[in-house]
Amino acid sequence: MDNTKEILTLAVEIGDAMLRCGAEIYRVEDSVIRILEAFGLDDFDAYVLSNGIFASANESREDACSVVRYVPLSATHLGKLAALNQLTRDICNHKCSVAEASERLKQCKNIPVYANAVQLLACGIGCAAFTFMFGGHLPEALYAFFVGLIEQ
């Protein structure tokens, strides 16, 4: 297969984006493996850690290639993660080519994050709601709201 490096790089980039969005390590590793299989690679290895991805293909042939990627910790973004999971499903169902998958990956990476004010407010409201849910009253909920703002 002449585009092995392109496929391997795409799979690792999708895994990188998933890790950055807060995906579990086993899910990222499984997704990378499934993507490589979906594009027809059969001689490959992929290993995912909490802050890195190691992948290689065609180790026994002349066109062997490897990709190592450091993935720094970042904030959780479930919207991006859902889009990346859908992209992985579409690749596994053979609904997109390598070029289409690369373009969709760029779109997934450009999904905007919520403004800090919205995130702070949501955290405060969530803390207050849990206070009510566990039997607290208005004074405790107000304290929880402000603690949620501070701790966010």
Positions of predicted regions on the chain:
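Core alpha-helical transmembrane segments of integral membrane proteins
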Residues: P112-Q152
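A short glycine/serine-rich beta->alpha loop
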Residues: R69-Y70, N110-Y114
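Short, flexible active-site-proximal loops enriched in glycine and acidic residues
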Residues: C92-A101, A115-L120
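Soluble N-terminal domains of membrane-associated systems
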Residues: M1-C96
